[in-house]
C-alpha cells in the first residue's frame, strides 16, 4: 500500500465511518464464522476435538479472508486500475473505526451531560460487553474510557499497523482474527476450547499494536497537558501487567495515567460480578469531563498513528 492510498482510506473512514446500511467485510466474516462453526462442531466431541476444529475454523477464516481480498483487488486492478485503487481505498477504510468509535463514545457522553442516564446506559451497551442497566454516571464514564483505550488498538492502530505492513489483505486478516476472538474467543463452557486458537491468535496479533497504542496515548497526552507524558508513561509501565489481558492492560493503564484517573474495579457480565485490577489506583475515579478528555486523546493518538504509518510507507517507497 502507498501512503496516498492509506491517506485516502483514513480520510474516508473519518468522513463516512461505517454506516450500518453499507456492506462491510466484517459482517461477511461474521457470517463465515457462524456458518463454519455448526458443521465443524459435528466433527467431534471433547477438548482435543473442539480445539482442533476451532483452530481449523480460525485458520480457514483468517487465511481465506486475506486470500479473497487479495485476489479481488488484483482482479479489479487488472481490468481497471483506477477502480481497483478505489476498491483498495474503500476496503482499507472498512478496516478502520476512528469515526464510529468517537461517535459512539460521544453519544454516551452527550446523554450523560444532559442527565439522560438511561439513554447513556443504552448507548453504552452498543460498545461494551458488560451489563449496563444498573451503572451510575461514574461507572458509565469508566466503561467509556476503558473502551476507548482498548478500541484505539483494536479498531484503529492495529489495522493501521497491518495496512502499513502488508496492505489491505493483511489488515483484513487482522479484522478476521479480531472478529473470531469477539465471537468465539470466550472463556466459557461452550467456547473455552473451541475458541482457544482464535483467542491466542488475537493476543499475538495485538502484541506490537497495543504497545504502539499505549505509547501514542502517552504522546497524545503530552500535547494536551504539561507533565501528562510522564504520568502516562509511569502508570503504563507500572500497571500494564496487572490486567488479565496482555494487550488491553497496555492501553488502559496508559490512558489511566494520561487522564489522571483510576480505571478497573468491578464489572458485571451476565449478572456475574468480575473484579478487575485497579489501574492508576492513586487517582480519583473518572467523571464526564474525563471522558471528554479521553475522546481528545483517542482522536490525537489516531492521527499520530496514521502519520506514523505514512512516514513508514514513504520511507519504504523511497528506500
What do these predicted ranges mean?
Residues 1-172, 177, 185-319:
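Hydrophobic alpha-helical transmembrane segments
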Residues 182:
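Solvent-exposed interhelical
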Amino acid at each position: 500500500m502507498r501512503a496516498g492510498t492509506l491517506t485516502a482510506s483514513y480520510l474516508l473512514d473519518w468522513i463516512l465511518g461505517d454506516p450500518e446500511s453499507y456492506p462491510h467485510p466484517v459482517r461477511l466474516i461474521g457470517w463465515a464464522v457462524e456458518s463454519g462453526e455448526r458443521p465443524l462442531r459435528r466433527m467431534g466431541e471433547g477438548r482435543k476435538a473442539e480445539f482442533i476444529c476451532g483452530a481449523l475454523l480460525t485458520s480457514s477464516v483468517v487465511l481465506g479472508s486475506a486470500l479473497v481480498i487479495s485476489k479481488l483487488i488484483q482482479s479489479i486492478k487488472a481490468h481497471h486500475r483506477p477502480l481497483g485503487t478505489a476498491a483498495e481505498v474503500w476496503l482499507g477504510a472498512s478496516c478502520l473505526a476512528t469515526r464510529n468509535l468517537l461517535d459512539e463514545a460521544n453519544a454516551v457522553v452527550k446523554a450523560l451531560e444532559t442527565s439522560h442516564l438511561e439513554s447513556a446506559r443504552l448507548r453504552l451497551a452498543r460498545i461494551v460487553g458488560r451489563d449496563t442497566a444498573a451503572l451510575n454516571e461514574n461507572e458509565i464514564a469508566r466503561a467509556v474510557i476503558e473502551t476507548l483505550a482498548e478500541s484505539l488498538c483494536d479498531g484503529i492502530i492495529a489495522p493501521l499497523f497491518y495496512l502499513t505492513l502488508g496492505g489491505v489483505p493483511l489488515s483484513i486478516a487482522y479484522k478476521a482474527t479480531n472478529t473470531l476472538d469477539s465471537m468465539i474467543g470466550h472463556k466459557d463452557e461452550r467456547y473455552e476450547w473451541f475458541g482457544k486458537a482464535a483467542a491466542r491468535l488475537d493476543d499475538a496479533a495485538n502484541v506490537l499494536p497495543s504497545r504502539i497504542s499505549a505509547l501514542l496515548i502517552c504522546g497524545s497526552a503530552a500535547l494536551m497537558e504539561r507533565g501528562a507524558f510522564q504520568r502516562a508513561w509511569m502508570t503504563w509501565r507500572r500497571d500494564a501487567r496487572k490486567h488479565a489481558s496482555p494487550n488491553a492492560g497496555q492501553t488502559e493503564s496508559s490512558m489511566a495515567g494520561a487522564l489522571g484517573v483510576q480505571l478497573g474495579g468491578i464489572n458485571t457480565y451476565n449478572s456475574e460480578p468480575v473484579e478487575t485490577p485497579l489501574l492508576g489506583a492513586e487517582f480519583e475515579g473518572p467523571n464526564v469531563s474525563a471522558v471528554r478528555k479521553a475522546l481528545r486523546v483517542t482522536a490525537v493518538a489516531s492521527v499520530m498513528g496514521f502519520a506514523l504509518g505514512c512516514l513508514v510507507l514513504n520511507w519504504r517507497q523511497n528506500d
